[in-house]
Swiss-Prot record:
Transmembrane segments: 1350-1370, 1402-1422
GO cellular component terms, A-Z: cytosol; Golgi apparatus; membrane
Glycosylation positions in this chain: 296, 900, 965
Disulfide linkage: none
Lumenal side: 26-1349, 1423
Membrane topology: Multi-pass membrane protein
Location within or outside the cell: Golgi apparatus, trans-Golgi network membrane; Prevacuolar compartment membrane
Signal peptide stretch: 1-25
Alphabetical keyword list: Glycoprotein, Golgi apparatus, Membrane, Protein transport, Receptor, Repeat, Signal, Transmembrane, Transmembrane helix, Transport
Domain of life: Eukaryota
Protein name (database record): Vacuolar protein sorting/targeting protein 10
Pfam families assigned to the protein according to its UniProt record, in alphabetical order: Sortilin-Vps10, Sortilin_C
Amino acid sequence: MIVRSLLLAGSLLLASVVPASFTLAKSDGPQIKVKEFDKVPTDVHYFEDTDTIILSGKKAELYISTDAAASWNLLEGKTGILYPNKYHTQSAVIYGPNRKHWVTFDAAKTWREFEVPDKLAFGGGFMPFTFHGKDAEKVLLSAEECQFMTCRHVTYYTTDGFKTVKRLFEGDMGCFWAVGNPAFGEGEPHLPDKLDDRVFCIWPHATPLDLTRRLVYSDTYFSDRKAVAVEAGGRDIKGVNNMASVKKFLLLAASSVGTSEAAIYVSKDAVHWDRADFYGGPKVRGGKFTVLESTNYSIQVNVASRRSRVPIGSLFTSDSTGTSFTMNLDGVNEDKDMITDFEQVSGIQGIFLVNIVENAEEVKKGATREKKLVSRISFDDGRTFKPLKCGDKELHLHSITRPSNIGRTYSSPAPGLVMGIGNTGDKLGTYETGDTFVSNDAGVTWRKALDKAHKYEFGDQGSLLVAVFDEYKDKIFTDEISYSLNHGKDWKKAKLPHRVTALQLTTTPDSTSLQFLLVAEDEKKKFYVMSIDFSDVHERKCEKKDFERWPARLDEKGEPDCLMGHKQFYKRRKADADCFVKEKFKEPLPETEPCQCTKEDFECAAGFLRNKDYECEPHRKVSPPEGKCKNPDDKFMGPSGYRLIPGDDCLKKGGVDLEKEVERTCKDATKAPVSGQISVETTPFKTKNLNYRYLERSDTSSGDDETVILKTDDGDLFVTRDHGKTWQRGKFKEPISLYIPHKYDNDVIYLLTEGKKAYWSIDRAHTFHSFEGKLPITRTLGTLPLYFHPDHPDWLIWIGGQDCKGKKCTDLAYYSKNRGDEWDLLLRGVGKCMFVGKEGELTADDLIFCSQHEHEDPSKSLRLISSDDMFTKKTSIHFDGKPIVGYAKMSEFIVVATKNGTELSSFTSVDGKTFAHAAFPPNYHIDAEYAYTVLDSSTHSIFLHVTDHPAKMHEFGSILKSNSNGTSYVLSLPNANRNDRDYVDFEKIQVVEGVALANIVINPDEVKGKGQEKKFRTLITHNDGSEWALLPPPKKDVDGKSFDCKVKDKGTDDCALHLHGFTERRENRDSMSSGSAVGLIIGVGNVGSSLTPRAESDTYMSRDAGITWHQIKKGRYQWEFGDQGSIVVVVAEEKPTKVLSYSLDEGETWTDFEFSDKEVTVEDISTVPSDTSRNFILWCRPGSSNEIVAYNVDFSGLKEREKQCVLKKESPEADDYYLWSPKHPMQKNNCLFGHVSMYHRKRPEAKCYNGPKLDRLSSEKKNCECTRQDYECDYNYGRQSDGSCALVKGLKPADPMQICKDDPEAIEYFEPTGYRKLPVSTCEGGHQLDHLVARPCPNKKKEFDEKHPGIGGFGLFFAIFFPVAIATGVGYWAFSKWDGKFGRIRLGESQPESIFSRDSPLISVPVTIVAGTVAVITALPLLFSSLWRSFRGYTRLPGSWWGQRQRPYASRGAFAARRGEYVGVVDDEDELLGAEEFEGDEEEDV
């Protein structure tokens, strides 16, 4: 039941005056009793099957009546908000103040007080109480636990009616009962043993570095500290947003990065989950669908249209499984809050009313914003819809989007009685001009009941209709009510004691009572609660002769109709009978008669859909039985496509049976078994330059297409949906200048022309729609023409060029919130503008940052400004308007470069409001003419490359790494190579945490002083840039021969493996690793003392994330990973060939395959960015022609990849997979960043394919004790040659007491040690190198002593004497055994087993090492914001057994982004294919 309160705010106070009583004679009408109130009540709640009512007010006063509103009393000692238990109508809970609450299980006769340790959640998407569907004593409580400025969500539970309240889950995003509805589980044969105890919780952090929310469950209230993740199709369901109980169904909504499409999963047993498919209408988008009132055998969902600027939806109805939805009706009316004009007629199966937008297509196209609303009714469960008829005119009624009363809009449990406010004509008018209409045959026919709009209610099972004039909006008062005793045919009036305007009119929920309650306001703003009692209007109680057997549904002939295998009848009082039923609280129940089975009793079976003729036809090809279909003309007996709807009780005998198998032809069946061959398809294109783009699929994307678009030099656009097997040419009037994929939605792409004209597609390039910008796109070098919003896919910023001279324009920024239909000016004279608001962060949706030229003159310097109202009224000028060089949005940071005289400075913000100055390493100055490039921020730190030497062809610089809030940088790697386009030889290895490769210049002095050519070496880090090492060379080459140099396990200056990096890559989107082929790396290089020219290189591969390497091919090869690494393809680089090589065992063995009958030069090899496909495209050039030939190479036919691999989470190594853990080469255990991570990897010998993307990271993980590898040098400290950290000479550490000044709640601070913990590390205990000696904050000595209690005098004696005695002996022993290297805490190899290792506090503590803790006061808000950020503002605090919170990340670095995981590449937004002018400056180049 939808409850709408239209009452004014205010406190509910009983008036001090004596309540009035107004009584009419028995024959004249109802008896009316009045209570006067000073303030209006805000809610009315009836306890079902009782005369008990509770009223609540704004100040939390509660009043109770036990005689159907005849008298009222204050509910003594209880204030708060009443939450009724909708499944157990005698039960309700009062949400009280000060953590005290009350519960009743006997309709407010008695109350029990209870307390909850934390404040119950209120708002923010959480309800304080979640009731069990079957057990009134089982309740989940949603609470909020806060410390300082950080809060986390906590769920409590009770199973004994609040006698005890226990903690269930910490840091969740909401918990739910499996039995959330009384109907759940009914009729299901196999249900869990403890289904009634099963609880689901949305868990936001499934892994240390994985923020994709899972749904987990427990049958023991998590008492065993075990949570089982919900799966569908053998994969964890990720990105869970919400869960709901709908009759017999559990629904789960999930979303994913890279698409606005949402996935809906359904379960009928709380065990097995299947994704729901939606056919024939718009795709389901996150937050853009509404689950409507449904039945036990079907779910109704309204899906919002993405095309429309005003709210319009499409009505979908599911089959009995809840997993196959078909669109029944398009253009359904809804409001901006997704409230939908849809309501079922109460108590009668298959009848519902809906309002639709008749001019929906015009509205969607933007031709008009005015909706033409018309009403429709369905009598057959949504199969067909008809107009409402009042005589020979069409009738249109206001619905849920325009509520006028509480409760249902049209009907009640009174059988067949339906009322509404509306008008006849061609469309729905305003509510104020509407009249009141009534139907007594469930909507088949209608008559006008009363002039003007009225609030109305049903009583005595429909024998009595009551209405009161409803013009509260215009403050029109009335002193009478209307009532009908004959189903609305005739109406009588009764006087009210005051002239009032009605606020609420209601009665008992079952509509069996003769007593009604009216809440009203008079002209003097006094408020009344009136009890209107019709009990004495009829003296006689109805007898048998006064009732009729009323058929609930009639067919076109007026005969009783069948639905779900039966006819439905009610015992109903005849309209003209002069009696009352007087069976209070006895709701009428339907009688049924069975029908013979007809076509309507069957639904489409799995794999079949209804066509326009309502026949079930195959949605996909039917699989023939084993041994059948040897020839295409063969036939076989297969499924009919129909099945009887579960719960349908029709009689099969003598009826229709559509479930019998039917004969089918083999040519229409699924294709034959795999051929064992690799297939090739070729397509030529007349273009010299290669410009292509994949439209990647995300986790929640539906469909299975593999779409690629290609733009030719002439501006033609080609699209393939089968990965290059077939192509279609786009039909556009103007040549396409460039295409821009949506940065945050992979299904969306924009095509731009040279002028104002542009096109967009939101359905993966299936259809395109045109729009125009206000100005032609900018031609200013380095400026992008389109920017996108991360959460609102239809919001755009358009940068248009004005007064362009060559490649320099006066640029204007416009914004649109409807995909270019309408534009409004943002600013003139801009550099660039971008949305920076993002869900889960402390930023507004409308927050925009712009760099703008002073005085709007493009020859002037840039300044940084921002606004959260589109620059209409509020504009914030940052850095006092001082010049900036540029800014970038990187994952969780906004980084700004400012110009200060001859130096560059960097500032960082995580909330878009407060910027903190980034402290660079001591004595490190960045020349204002130099550049720095933001490389990566995927591990909660910013990697920054700063140019030290900018001479053309001799560029190199330093890689700096920030702390967790981007305010303090330390040197990670000096002399890192870069090129003249500001690309850097730095690449993160995807999936595996903290591993990166970089090339350094080993002769910097010679390059600087003598202009010599750069010489390079390749280094690798396994701990996020804290330590770098040379790559170990392979022991043998591919032919089994030794290299010219040898080492044991580590690379040396004379002998190591060196690989060519990003600056030499021909295709920026290629990468050495893969987001799905975990641990695999391929590169081109050589073994020796330094990197040799690329032409002299060979091809190498690592299978363990860079620990060991193997030569796989002599010479230079291009490579691609397919099927998540189970297929690796390489092909010769820059030389004619017709052969590719592939490996099915991670590079152990290779097979050659001839893909062409003539030699071609392979320009590039590609596959889907996720590397999950078994298809590849070789982009080849025949000879020196100006033609590109696309070769689709399909490995799906291989026998070795015929079946899908099996992964069982409960036994992950039992079948086709094993668990693999990355490691640090200098550690004996597998701890990396404080934890052991285990990844699912397919066994190389397993003959199967991976299929959909795996959840690579296993849930089997553990945190480790802290060691040196979990720390890096703090600010103002530098790494020494032995790996330790020491204070830089001449510098002082920052004041460690700054934390006490910044945080008034702080009790202690720690003396600096020179070390800081890696932001990505989750280690616990062990060696806390950054927290050795604690000191009390000023005036906090007492609290400090309580936290660190001391010892008594006797203990003090032993604390002094005993260590001195022991130290004398131990010191001598240690001196004789130790290597003399006291005095450093090192970040070298870790051997923590010995207490005399360099890790040992016995060695390290006596030596004082002072470190500089960052003391930038303005950084504190950044730190708080960083801690505060999580899904919709909630996060964890330390101490939860579910682990500590980890911040979100998604790498967007200064390299070209094709992989969807953590690798740093150029943002898709910045990669404007087909426009070379834009390649100079990337978004992250500051």
